[in-house]
Every structure is written in C-alpha cells, then in structure tokens.
Amino acid sequence: MTIRDLHVHFQGHEIAVLSANEHIDEPAIVFIPGVLAPINFWLACLPESILKNRRWYAISLPGHQPSKVPLGYQAKDIDEDWLNHLYQSVISQLEGKRRVIVVGHSTGGFSALNLAVNNSDSLLGVISIAGFFKGDWGGIEGQLVKLAGLGKWAKPLFQASLAISRKIPVLQAYISSLLAYDRHTYNDSPMTKKMLEEIQDNMQAQNLSALFPLFNRISNFDIYPKLNAIKVPVTIMAGSHDPVIDASQSLILAAAIRHAQLVVFDNAGHMPFMERTQQFNNELCAAIDQFMQSINK
C-alpha cells in the first residue's frame, strides 16, 4: 500500500486527501468520513483487501484536521449545494472526468448521496454507511448538532465540550462507544483501539472553531425531495439500532431511490465496522465488486 498526503483547494479551503495505490489501473474509490473523524479514520476501518489492492482516496469533511479553512468561514456558507460543489470540485481535480465510486459514513454518507443527486454521469455507484437524507440526529452527536444549532452564543460551550472530551483518553473512548449499539463488541474490537490511535494526532491538532459551521448547519440538510434524481446504483447500509441516525431514515432512502440495495446490520448501531466487522467487510467488498463489474457492461 502506497499513500500520499495531499491538499486540494476549493474556495479558500485546503481539503485534506489521502491518495492510495495510484499505480493500480482501475476506477478510484472515494471515502468520506463522518463528523469529528479525520481522513485516517479509514486506515483502521477498511478491510486489507481494499486498503492494499484498490485505488482509493479519503477526502476530508471541511474544517476537519488536517484540512484548513479560510478566514471568514461561516455557517451561512454551507448548504447541500455548497457541499456538492466542494466534493465535485475535489474529485474532478483528482480524477478529471473518470467515474468513481463514492463511499461515505454518516455525514460522509449524506455527502455521497448528495453527489449522486447531482452528478450521476461522474459516478459508478454510491455506498452510504449510516448515512442520512435529513439532518435529524439523536445520541451524543445529535446533542452537539442541537447545541451548535442554537447559534453563535453556543459556540464557546460547543468548543469546550469537544476540548474536554479530547483531553481525557478514557472519556474519549467512552464517548466514541456511545455511537455503537453493541458496545461490548465495539469495545472489544481491536479495530476500535486502532481507530482511536489513528485519529489521535489530528484530533489533538484540530481547530475546534473550524468544526462549528458544519455542525451548525447539519440540522438544515434535507435532500429527500431530490432523491428521485439519483440514477446510479446505490447501496444503503445501516445498523438496526443506530443511536445517531435512526434506521427509519435508511428504510426511507431505500424506498425512495430506484433499485437501491439495503443492507441491515442486526442489533448494531452507528459503527458497523467494529460492531459487525465480518458482515460489513463482506457487504462492502461485494458492493464495490458489483460497481466495478458494471464498467464492462
């Protein structure tokens, strides 16, 4: 596995990218993480068969270390169209007119679906893992979204909450476990420890102020009216007991998107990578293989 660290520019933002296995001659897979997760999250959460044998990129959410934001970056800058243009631009700068597969987790899943709404001609397929069409969240991350949604006066409290959690490793691990439903399996998974180690440097270096605009706007996201515009193959993956994105959102997505395939991880939450590792790896690889095979049809 060969990896390069890149930064791609978009409207004053420097969007961090990992570019892997550029020598492999096949369509690239683009991975977009969820909020609070730097791009190296994927190094711990993907199967070796993908990490080593596929050509892939991991593209950051805006404002997430090591990405950089411009002076004057504000919540009012962000909506569904802006996110679409951001990822459309970054992918185009990386891949030109070549079609790609996009895989996203949580807000990354939303971003992948949002790309599919607007850019069918540039995509081979989309996989949404615990993604959503509407920014109606529960759990610990839902509380952060609600807090940020109160406006500028809540920003110091938002930042303080994140600062406290990242300073205390035991607290950070506990809070991450609240994303899972099967916490016993999540906590026992070696992948969990690896993930927390992989993201640690970026988490500690994170400019917490840069996270606020996206969190402030998430509750306003809603692409449901546009889902019928999706014309590419889509796989929806969801935990049956996701505490952040209610599983009903995934059922609605699967019903609203033509020919969408639905994969449900029974008795799992927001982190199927750890909660249902073997099933997740099998389903992810199968979906990617299916999209790759469509090139020759």
Which residues does each PLM region occupy?
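Active-site loop/oxyanion-hole signature of alpha/beta-hydrolase fold enzymes
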Residues: 57-103, 282
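Short beta-strand/loop motif that positions the catalytic acidic residue
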Residues: 230, 236-238
